[in-house]
Regions:
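Sec-dependent bacterial lipoprotein signal peptides
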Residues: 1-13
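Intrinsically disordered, low-complexity polar regions and short flexible loop motifs
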Residues: 15-221
């Protein structure tokens, strides 16, 4: 008989006598705040996980069991709020991006969700992808291998787009963002060090002092 004990989304322990099906492994959830100047009181399933969830903040991984989970935020400066439901599968890592967009009533808070479901990197390879949550238009991006000749274009690079994972050799890689049809560098993000079997997401964000900034989100280890 198994008697799993769930500690409010943060841990899973079980007493196991060796019979019955294996308990769910759970998934890892991270949230990234991409709205300059905004801050929220962030809760997952009613439990406050960050009382000052502000621009550029990436939460530590939160373990969630398969099923529906409520993600809530209340602005610390006005009446803005969000209340979303994430349907989590087992053994899948999720990134939820808190962003703003334009709706029928003006600016609204919206979510972007990315997961690492899929086969993962090929044997001996790592994987990289880009999540673009900057509103700067007219840009292109590619990954460049540090000290090598490797270069991998990013196929989807526009506001709220999350590219597919691209397999790359292990090593140090940087994301280079330029204006379309130009050789300038708007953002150089990295280097990002990856070993075989790892997957990483580079999130591109707007920035107050400059046009762009970035955050690195671990996916698979």
């Amino acid at each position: 008989m198994r008697c799993p004990v769930v500690a409010a989304l943060l841990a899973l322990a079980a007493c196991d006598t060796g019979s019955g099906p294996a308990p769910p492994m759970g998934s890892r959830l991270r949230l990234l705040e991409t709205i300059p100047g905004a801050a929220f009181r962030l809760s997952v399933d009613g439990r406050v996980v960050n009382a000052n969830f502000h621009f550029g903040t990436l939460t530590p991984a939160i373990v969630v069991l398969p099923g529906q989970h409520t993600l809530s935020g209340q602005s610390l400066s006005d009446t803005s709020s969000f209340d979303w439901v994430l349907a989590a599968a087992d053994s899948v890592n999720y990134i939820v991006f808190v962003t703003d967009t334009t709706g029928s009533s003006g600016a609204v808070i919206a979510s972007g969700v990315a997961s690492d479901s899929g086969p993962g990197p090929a044997a001996g390879q790592a994987a990289l992808r880009v999540a673009d949550f900057s509103k700067v238009a007219g840009l292109v991006a590619h990954f460049s291998e540090t000290g090598g000749a490797g270069s991998v274009p990013v196929s989807s690079f526009f506001f709220r787009a999350v590219s597919a994972f691209t397999d790359v050799p292990p090593g140090d890689w940087s994301l280079v963002v330029s204006h379309t049809n130009m050789t300038d560098t708007v953002l150089l993000a990295g280097p990002v060090s990856v070993v075989a079997g790892q997957a990483r997401t580079v999130a591109v964000l707007d920035s107050g002092p400059g046009p762009l900034t970035w955050r690195l989100v671990p996916d698979r280890n």
